[in-house]
UniProtKB/Swiss-Prot annotation:
Transfers an acetyl group from acetyl-CoA to L-homoserine, forming acetyl-L-homoserine. Substrate binds at R220, D349. Homodimer. This is Homoserine O-acetyltransferase. Belongs to the AB hydrolase superfamily. MetX family. Residues 43-354 form the AB hydrolase-1 domain. Gene3D superfamilies: 1.10.1740.110, alpha/beta hydrolase. It holds the Pfam family Abhydrolase_1. Its EC number is 2.3.1.31. It catalyses: L-homoserine + acetyl-CoA = O-acetyl-L-homoserine + CoA. GO terms for cellular component: cytoplasm. Keywords: Acyltransferase, Amino-acid biosynthesis, Cytoplasm, Methionine biosynthesis, Transferase. It comes from Sulfurimonas autotrophica (strain ATCC BAA-671 / DSM 16294 / JCM 11897 / OK10). Pathway: Amino-acid biosynthesis; L-methionine biosynthesis via de novo pathway; O-acetyl-L-homoserine from L-homoserine: step 1/1.
Amino acid sequence: MSLNLQTYTEHFTNPLYLESGRILEPYDITYETYGTMNEDKSNVVVVCHALTGSHHAAGLYEDETKPGWWDGFIGSGKAIDTDKYFVICSNVIGSCFGSTGPMSLQHPYQEPYRYKFPVVSIKDMVKAQRILFDRLDIHRVHAIVGGSMGGMQALQFAIHYPNFANKIIALATTHATQPWAIAFNKVAQESILNDPDFKQGYYDPDLLKEQGLSGMAVGRMAGHISFLSHESMREKFGRDYKLTDGLYELFGKFQVESYLEYNGYNFTKWFDPLAYLYITKAINIYDLSRGFDSLAEALKRVTSALYLVSFKNDLLFKNFEMKEIADELDKIGNKNHSYIDVKSDYGHDAFLVELNKFENHVKDALNG
């Protein structure tokens, strides 16, 4: 069957009250859908994207050669089967792919927010999505699925909207961002802030799309290191040297160096640096226990079936961080959860690239 890819943007004029006490109004949310919603709306699956992801999770636009970021996972006969499920993925507020973010025009001034944009949290991102679903007359969904920052959103849904989803599937994530991950984000943030072409946030976005931003590229290289693992780097690159470079050339490169350069500099031409600063801030301050006496108290609110998936060699969100959630659920007597640690050498990116290692688990969770 057809993927039935549709893209929409909803405009909201009511204020969005943020966790910080700030207000965002008006605001837009861009989202994409796949499959067909059944009559009683019982087949809705929400997919939440990661830091640099977007609402475009699957399929191809007419002018595209590269499909959505989870195309191998969403579609006819795939783990999230669009022959069965109606899938919705929205771009989070604070991002740069259609939903309101720091480079959106501030009402009524018609100038980009830039630093006037309020800090948003993962909880705020989820709240905005919940408002979107109310607009769409969707008040309960079959499941919410997300990896990395998407997993953070899924877990926030479980705690703050406990009656919204039958099932929550969280992959490669954590209950609170730890110093190791915050440190990688700090390198990226400082690299952006100290690039003179960033112009203290008053850069020309069109110029950056052409030229990129070298500071952001360096920060992204650091990020890529945290997404991989020692094992995956060794397997992918070894000590291979670029065939066109001389071993004794000062700037001759190993293949791993070339990989980091390509991905780092290419990234800066399609992702906005202010959005990167705001979203990494949201990730850094993420903590499921905020507002509760403990993580256990927060998890007592969960009524959905909870499926936790970690990856053995994940450097960014270590597998024991997910195990801590499972352990707390055990302690409070929650019987409606499962935890698996997937053996993978791909590190954090395994949830994007090594789908065969866990897709059957997700299928079983959705269909069970």
